């Protein structure tokens, strides 16, 4: 293993001024152990840490970097926008341009409101659904993560799952009292709760294809059934495409499974790697937002011109050829991983959602959060470090997606192929 002394020093320094040394928990390597790598630069599919070690990037900033890092068109757009000013607190032309780009890609979306993070997008969509329907209760699914607003942290995935938390201290009973949590991919459970509370439920929110309990795609027809049930009871359907949006296809998950939700949330890819997100949907619903309607939502940096430039440049470069390359790269990577684990005698599942996937250890298919938690997650740290020590940077959690970019090339795949046999043997030798 190459030296990580400087990363270790930087982590210790960060711990003296930042809780846990990181600004998002999964970055601390809490579930896999070892020294978090402090990244100082990235280009294409390669990361470089403070010690000068290079890694093939299979995290892609948790999804946004579909074109790879420092893509020339994105860098040029950001530099040009920054030269004109960083933030104005006033409308800018690029806000409407990015909104139009999203609307053109996702047919049910008629109006867009831009915000700063996926958490803001889902939180605001929930408030809007409640304001539009005049109802209080919301339905979410176990293992689905919709950001860290209080009402949506109950039995969530992502970092909450990684740390083994049922929710979070500080989320009061009152904040979560109107949140109903159901098992994922279970239509009868949804029908039952609507039978009891149908006229009190404002909305159902679900990840369009979950990626925060690992990749656990919806069973065929599940999202369509949610659409049918919510429509029958006058509730709204919110499809959270913060992760899948503009990654798995030009139209996100809607391009794979065209269910016409009332509201969609977006983030990650649409921001080009800078802080931006959005929610949008039917004009009848969106027009209830201030300044047209009574549902308040605002943000000092919403529609930031530099973030808009990054998002526009990314989406405009993400053409059909780019999505074909993403799919080919995901096929190639998943195939290499599967072959190595099979050769090492490790039972595994590699569920896919387009070019997103996860690696679960165990023989049983994973269709919900309970099944994800029942996998042999204790094998993951050994597998993770086997790859990391060989120059491949996978997600540092068993409950997160693996992401590819169009920048992955033969040199990167050669590095991955060389690293996998040892990592697979380490997973095979791991003990609970």
UniProtKB/Swiss-Prot annotation:
Subcellular localization: Cytoplasm
Residues recorded with modification N6-(pyridoxal phosphate)lysine: 268
A GO CC annotation given for this chain: cytoplasm
Recorded catalytic activity of this chain's protein: (S)-4-amino-5-oxopentanoate = 5-aminolevulinate
Record pathway: Porphyrin-containing compound metabolism; protoporphyrin-IX biosynthesis; 5-aminolevulinate from L-glutamyl-tRNA(Glu): step 2/2
Any Pfam family hit: Aminotran_3
GO terms of biological process kind: protoporphyrinogen IX biosynthetic process
Cofactor or coenzyme needed: pyridoxal 5'-phosphate
Domain of life: Bacteria
UniProt KW keywords: Cytoplasm, Isomerase, Porphyrin biosynthesis, Pyridoxal phosphate
Enzyme kind, highest EC tier: isomerase
EC number annotated for this UniProt entry: 5.4.3.8
PROSITE patterns linked to this entry: AA_TRANSFER_CLASS_3 (PS00600)
Gene Ontology MF, one: pyridoxal phosphate binding
Family of this protein: Belongs to the class-III pyridoxal-phosphate-dependent aminotransferase family. HemL subfamily.
Quaternary structure annotation from Swiss-Prot or TrEMBL: Homodimer.
Protein's recorded name: Glutamate-1-semialdehyde 2,1-aminomutase
Organism name: Mycolicibacterium vanbaalenii (strain DSM 7251 / JCM 13017 / BCRC 16820 / KCTC 9966 / NRRL B-24157 / PYR-1)
């Amino acid at each position: 293993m190459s030296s990580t002394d400087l990363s270790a020093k930087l982590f210790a320094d960060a711990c003296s001024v930042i809780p846990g040394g990181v600004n998002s928990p999964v970055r601390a390597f809490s579930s896999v152990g070892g020294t978090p790598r402090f990244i100082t630069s990235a280009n294409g599919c390669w990361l470089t840490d403070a010690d000068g070690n290079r890694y093939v990037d299979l995290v892609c900033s948790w999804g946004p970097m579909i074109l790879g890092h420092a893509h020339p068109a994105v860098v040029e757009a950001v530099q040009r926008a920054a030269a004109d000013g960083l933030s104005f607190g006033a409308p800018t032309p690029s806000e409407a341009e990015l909104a139009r780009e999203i609307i053109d890609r996702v047919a049910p979306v008629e109006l867009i409101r831009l915000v700063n993070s996926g958490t803001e997008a889902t939180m605001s969509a929930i408030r809007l659904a409640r304001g539009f329907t005049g109802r209080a209760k919301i339905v979410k699914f176990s293992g689905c993560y919709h950001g860290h607003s209080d009402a949506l942290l109950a039995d969530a995935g992502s970092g909450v799952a990684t740390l083994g938390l049922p929710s979070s201290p500080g989320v009061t009973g009152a904040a979560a009292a109107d949140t109903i949590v159901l098992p994922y991919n279970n239509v009868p459970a949804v029908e039952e709760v609507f039978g009891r509370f149908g006229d009190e439920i404002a909305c159902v929110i679900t990840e369009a294809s979950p990626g925060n309990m690992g990749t656990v795609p919806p069973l065929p027809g599940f999202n369509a059934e949610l659409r049918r049930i919510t429509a029958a009871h006058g509730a709204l359907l919110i499809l959270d495409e913060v992760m899948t949006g503009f990654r798995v296809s030009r139209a996100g998950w809607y391009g794979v499974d065209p269910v016409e939700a009332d509201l969609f949330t977006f983030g990650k890819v649409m921001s080009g790697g800078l802080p931006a997100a959005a929610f949008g949907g039917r004009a009848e619903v969106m027009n209830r937002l201030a300044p047209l309607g009574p549902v308040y939502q605002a943000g000092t940096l919403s529609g930031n011109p530099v973030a808009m430039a990054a998002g526009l440049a990314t989406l405009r470069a993400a053409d059909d050829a780019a999505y074909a390359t993403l799919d080919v790269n995901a096929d190639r990577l998943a195939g290499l991983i599967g072959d190595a684990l099979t050769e090492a005698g490790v039972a595994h599942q590699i569920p896919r959602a387009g070019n997103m996937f996860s690696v679960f250890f165990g023989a049983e298919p994973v269709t919900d959060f309970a099944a994800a938690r029942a996998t042999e997650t204790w094998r993951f740290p050994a597998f993770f470090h086997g790859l990391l020590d060989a120059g491949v940077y996978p997600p540092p959690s068993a409950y997160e997606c693996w992401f590819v970019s169009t920048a992955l090339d033969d040199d990167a795949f050669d590095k991955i192929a060389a690293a996998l046999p040892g990592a697979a043997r380490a997973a095979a030798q791991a003990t609970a």
